[in-house]
A protein has these predicted regions:
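Flexible "arm" and connector segments at domain edges
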Residues: 1-129
Length: 129
């Protein structure tokens, strides 16, 4: 079924822009409800997303465009990711060891119970059921 341009931009006589305005939480409400801890969590999470994007860009240039891998940049971006992840762990009172152990339990206990990778287990994703 194909929708006309008008149908795409008008749903229940509301423009898409108006729908977004109606459904998105207002910025002031977010700010008003944010304490210092929440602001720090947001800051660290945004940092992780940004640095992950920069790392992905470096990898994209190598894999997609055939450029030499800029290992120095990869090291820098991985270091930046560690910085933000440590900040997030700290504000949440979590240790790196605790997180790595939980991930190991998830991978070996649910996803890859055999202890080795297989396409079948990866597709099954028992940890996501």
């Amino acid at each position: 079924m194909s929708l006309s341009d008008e149908a795409v931009y008008k749903i229940n006589n509301t423009s898409y822009e108006q729908m977004v305005n109606d459904l998105a939480k207002p910025g002031q409400a977010i700010v008003d409800g944010m304490n210092a801890k929440a602001a720090h969590i947001l800051h660290m999470s945004i940092g992780i997303a940004g640095e992950a994007g920069e790392l992905l860009d470096a990898i994209k240039k190598h894999v997609i465009y055939g450029k030499d891998l800029d290992v120095e940049n990869v090291i820098e971006e991985l270091g930046d990711l560690e910085f933000y992840m440590e900040g997030l762990r700290a504000v949440l009172s979590l240790s790196r060891k605790e997180i790595l152990m939980a991930n190991k339990v998830k991978l070996l206990g649910k996803r890859y119970a055999s202890g080795t990778y297989s396409d079948e287990q990866a597709k099954g994703r028992a940890d996501k059921e």
